From Swiss-Prot:
Gene3D superfamilies hit by this protein: PSTPO5379-like, PSTPO5379-like domain
Documented EC number(s): 4.2.1.-
Family to which the UniProt record says this protein belongs: Belongs to the D-glutamate cyclase family.
Keywords: Lyase
HAMAP family per the UniProt record, alphabetical: Hydro_lyase
Database matches in Pfam families: D-Glu_cyclase
Enzyme class (EC, first level): lyase
Protein name: Putative hydro-lyase ABSDF2257
An example Gene Ontology molecular-function term: lyase activity
Species of the source: Acinetobacter baumannii (strain SDF)
Length: 268
């Protein structure tokens, strides 16, 4: 749970401006937007599947840290004022029987056609990137204005009911001398994925080519840098695919919802 701390009015304004910009049609990855404000992933599943998913998230908290749950017919989250999860992500993916069938920028009609959906908002590693930058650690995909690279790993998540799947991981190249600091910073923020799950040796995670991510864009890895992998909130989408959930709506990887909660509120 986040700490109730005073929020800079300028940060709140930046977060609201970002949501309004997205609502008006902004369609790019959100890393670096409203810097210092928490971003979240999303998955909506039918009520009949909601308990299974809640249990799945509970059993896999590093990859699926639940920050809010919205009951059917509820589209505003306590994490942000003047919010609508049907319009405030830049892109949505529509899933049927484990297959992605569409990608849209406004999901209101789809939610209206499926009123039984329960929505889970999941912590996102974008929320520790400002802390990394403040420590002098470059976040490559922000620097290069690309999407973070994400990979389906060979790490099996703990199954729950009808839901199972493997962990998706995100990667950031970190200079070898800064890795210990990156671990210390992110370990303090378990609600947004916490410490890395793996350092170096992508092949150990079943990643054949680190330059060919399953989601997002490849990141440059310079001499002296090591690929560092964190659990990722795209893991629920891997579960949707593997479990062939009859219907689901998710965000598009890297296209997040921006909240009114400062990143530092999650620091332990």
């Amino acid at each position: 749970m986040y700490k109730d701390i005073k929020v800079d009015p300028a940060q709140l304004e930046a977060a609201l401006d970002a949501r309004l910009k997205i609502r008006a049609g902004f369609d790019k990855p959100t890393a670096g937007m409203a810097a210092g404000m928490t971003q979240v992933n999303m998955i909506s599943v039918p009520r009949d599947w909601a308990y299974d998913f809640l249990l799945y998230a509970h059993r896999n908290p590093q990859s699926c840290p639940v920050l809010d749950v919205l009951e059917e017919g509820i589209y505003a989250t306590k994490l942000a004022a003047d919010s609508d999860i049907r319009t405030d992500f830049p892109r949505y993916r529509i899933w049927k029987d484990g297959e992605m069938v569409d990608e849209v920028t406004d999901a209101r009609e789809i939610y209206n056609a499926h009123p039984d959906l329960v929505t889970f908002l999941i912590g996102c590693s974008f929320s520790f990137e400002t802390a990394l930058q403040e420590a002098g650690i470059e976040v490559r995909h922000i620097h290069d204005d690309t999407n973070v690279p994400m990979y389906l790993s060979n790490i099996k998540c703990e199954p729950a009911g009808r839901i199972s799947g493997n962990m998706v991981v995100s990667m950031r190249p970190i200079p070898s001398h800064q890795i210990s600091e990156a671990v210390k910073i992110t370990a303090r923020m378990p609600s947004v994925h916490g410490a890395p799950v793996h350092i170096g040796h992508p092949e150990s995670l079943g990643i054949k080519d680190v330059n060919k991510p399953d989601f997002g864009d490849a990141s440059r890895i310079e001499a002296g840098e090591i690929p560092v992998f964190w659990a990722c909130g795209v893991t629920p989408q891997a579960a949707v695919i593997n479990s062939k959930i009859p219907f689901a709506i998710s965000h598009a990887p890297g296209y997040m919802f921006i909240t009114d909660i400062p990143d530092r509120a999650w620091m332990g």
